[in-house]
């Protein structure tokens, strides 16, 4: 994923519509800010009732909300580059939020609830904001313009590329090899 030369114009939600993902909270955050929100997400069969009962009523006849459905990798760069920020108002301990890293790859800041891996991924005040609730998320939206999208991309390149991961693995293996004692010890030379 790479940044696209577009003018950001909406808040974004990417991924899956499920209670723990907080799409209803994202819609309320955008509404409180008076900013349009685009939701690019799938609805799994198990979450259909949540969508029908809670999300659909928030979307229908709401000019600020656009539900675009599930998108593929080809559309993600455009979607994320067009977002002022990505909202991730989760209420479960997300082990690793890939959508946050995808946003950062496009230079898009992230506003995410302080759950699970969020504080390890989002550098508060640099790549986005780690927040506690809807009120602090609304306040963070007002500060998104202060963040440098080019710097967000640089942080992604420094921390989350496949090359970075491979180098980290090599360093870990080297460290383990240096710490390990040899399994075979020579008592004396054969000469």
Predicted regions and their residues:
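Conserved donor-binding/catalytic core segment of Leloir-type glycosyltransferases
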Residues: 1-40
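Nucleotide-activated donor-binding/catalytic signature segment of Leloir-type glycosyltransferases, i.e.
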Residues: 39-41, 52-74
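Short alpha-helical donor nucleotide-sugar binding micro-motif in glycosyltransferases
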Residues: 70, 78-83, 169
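Acidic donor-binding loop of glycosyltransferase active sites
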Residues: 81-95, 108
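Short hydrophobic beta-strand element within catalytic cores of glycosyltransferases
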Residues: 105, 109-112, 122
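A short, well-ordered alpha-helix in the C-terminal region of glycosyltransferases
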Residues: 146-168, 175
